[in-house]
Structures are given as structure tokens and as C-alpha cells.
Amino acid sequence: MDYLTMFYDGWRDLMDNKSDPRTRDYPLMSSPFPTIAISLTYAYIVKVLGPKLMENRKPFELRKVLIVYNAAQVIFSAWLFYESCIGGWLNGYNLRCEPVNYSYSPKAIRTAEGCWWYYFSKFTEFFDTFFFVMRKRYDQVSTLHVIHHGIMPVSVWWGVKFTPGGHSTFFGFLNTFVHIFMYAYYMLAAMGPKVQKYLWWKKYLTVMQMIQFVLVMVHSFQLFFKNDCNYPIGFAYFIGAHAVMFYFLFSNFYKRAYVKRDGKDKASVKANGHANGHVKALKDGDVAPTSNGQANGFHNTFSKFTTDMCNPALNSSTRQRVLVNAGNK
């Protein structure tokens, strides 16, 4: 019991006295457990309950809903990116090391509120997966997708609770920028085949994500060598570790989705081109161009041979001479 009491007292001290008092009364900020529960519920719905409910149902037609939803996410992401720019990253923040401003100045409060709205945006992104399930696009509900969406609210919660501003908000600054393009792509893709043919740049969204994680790694891990601004180093470890994990998850996805597939497609095109040439030749009664001369020569010789051998005017000695000549050819 003593250990449990010590743990509880330490936990309450961490939540009540060590956290940022400015965000303490924000929605869902009193404890991490509601956020954890919501994230676990999300994972259960998209991997278990949702597919079960859709098992005997036809996929929903959500084209118009998807266009509106993704347009709203583009606007939301653009606003969050703007707030992160005004809050610091294009307005005085130092890329080398930036402390958290715990004051109640308008700029500091605006940054803290922007961090909370970024946290809230991670819940709105759950609808990406809900719509996949409703459309029975289960191939899109990958482990990478669910891990990425399920972990983010919990991860961001700690940042809003203890460090709503400063160095680690660089992650949100980049992430909202990438999401502008990502949701713009989804919005355009939902408009149908007439627009989809112009979306050749899909794979570069994944490249942008990976570049984002590399930049976050470099930005976070630099504090291990020199922490001039006394930023809480634990959060640098935390953000950097997330960036490493997500980088490898997205890198593996990119290799499976594009590198290996492109290799298979090239091999398939090469094989099909070779095979289709022969299939067409057989179907049309022709032969491959490289053997046409030999085949046509054989065809002419064989025709002359059969004509001569069947000619009743030829005597036996002449037939024998024709047979010998054909054998020599």
C-alpha cells in the first residue's frame, strides 16, 4: 500500500504541480486517461467493430462527404500552420534551441491555445479511418495507418500538458504544412476519375512525410549536444523517438507501395510485351518479325516440294531428284 500511495501522490504532484497551469483547465487536459481511452476505442472500432458491422452491408457512397470533409481539413490544417508561424516559427523562434514561454503574454497564450487545437485535430483525423471502414476499403486500414492515428493524440497530449510551445512545436509546424497537401490530395481524389488522372504526385506525399520526420529527428536530437535554452530534454527524446519510429514505418510503406511495385510493374511490362508479341503472332497467323524471313522461305520451299511431288507428269527419277534437293535445302 505504501508504494501505491507514493505512486499516487507522485502522479498527482506531476499532474497538478509540474504541468503548465495555463492549459490545466482545457478540455481533456486533466488526465491522459480519457485520451488513451478514446484512442483505444478508435483502434477497436476500425479494426474489429467497424468491419463486423459492415460485414453484410454494402459500402457507403461518400464522395460528396469526402470532398467536404477533406476541404475542411485543408482549411483547418492551413489555419494551424498559420498559427504556428505567427506563434513563433516565422516570428522569432530559434531553430537551434527555443525554450517554452510559460508567461501569460498574448503571444504565449496564443501559442498554447494553438497547441491544444493541434491536439484536437488528431481526433478529427480519426474520420479518415472511419470513412475507409464505411466504404469497405480495409486495405487502407493498415497497421501503419492505425498506429499513426492512434498514437498521435496521446503523444500530443503530453506536449500540451507540459510544454505547449517552444522547441518541440516544430513537429506540429511541419506536420500541419504536410497535411495541407495531404488533405488536398484526398479532396481531389474524391472528385472522381476526371481529376484522379492528374494526381500522379501521390507517392511524393509519403516522401514529404519522411522528410518531415528526418527534419524533426535532426531538430530534436541536436539538443543532446547543446541545450542552450534549457528546454526539457525528456521531451526532445520523446519527439525524436516518435520521429524515428514513424520514419521507419513510412519508409517500409514506401518501399512496399512504390519501390517493389514499380519493380514488379517493369518486369510485368517486359514479360507481357515479349509474350504479347508472340501471342499476337499466333493469333493473327503470323510469326515473330525476327523469324519471318526464315519462316516464309520454309513456307515457299515446302509448297514447291509438295507441288512437285504430287505432279503426276513427273517420273520416278525426277521425283527422287526433287526429294534429294529438298533434303539439301
UniProtKB/Swiss-Prot annotation:
Gene Ontology BP terms: fatty acid elongation; fatty acid elongation, monounsaturated fatty acid; fatty acid elongation, polyunsaturated fatty acid; fatty acid elongation, saturated fatty acid; long-chain fatty acid metabolic process; sphingolipid biosynthetic process; very long-chain fatty acid biosynthetic process
Record family assignment: Belongs to the ELO family.
A cellular component term, taken from the record's GO annotations: endoplasmic reticulum membrane
Gene disruption phenotype: RNAi-mediated knockdown leads to lethality before eclosion. RNAi-mediated knockdown in neurons leads to neurodegeneration in the central nervous system including degeneration of retina, defects in the fenestrated basement membrane and ommatidial disarray. Effects are probably due to altered levels of very-long chain fatty acids (VLCFAs). In contrast, glial-specific RNAi-mediated knockdown results in no defect.
Pfam families per UniProt: ELO
Membrane association type: Multi-pass membrane protein
TM region positions: 26-46, 66-86, 114-134, 146-166, 170-190, 205-225, 233-253
Chief site of localization: membrane
Record's keyword terms, sorted: Fatty acid biosynthesis, Fatty acid metabolism, Lipid biosynthesis, Lipid metabolism, Membrane, Transferase, Transmembrane, Transmembrane helix
Subcellular location: Membrane
EC number: 2.3.1.199
An MF annotation (GO) of this entry: fatty acid elongase activity
Role noted for this protein: Catalyzes the first and rate-limiting reaction of the four reactions that constitute the long-chain fatty acids elongation cycle. This endoplasmic reticulum-bound enzymatic process allows the addition of 2 carbons to the chain of long- and very long-chain fatty acids (VLCFAs) per cycle.
Catalyzed reactions per annotation: a very-long-chain acyl-CoA + malonyl-CoA + H(+) = a very-long-chain 3-oxoacyl-CoA + CO2 + CoA
Protein name per UniProt: Very long chain fatty acid elongase 7
InterPro entries assigned to the protein according to its UniProt record, in alphabetical order: ELO_fam
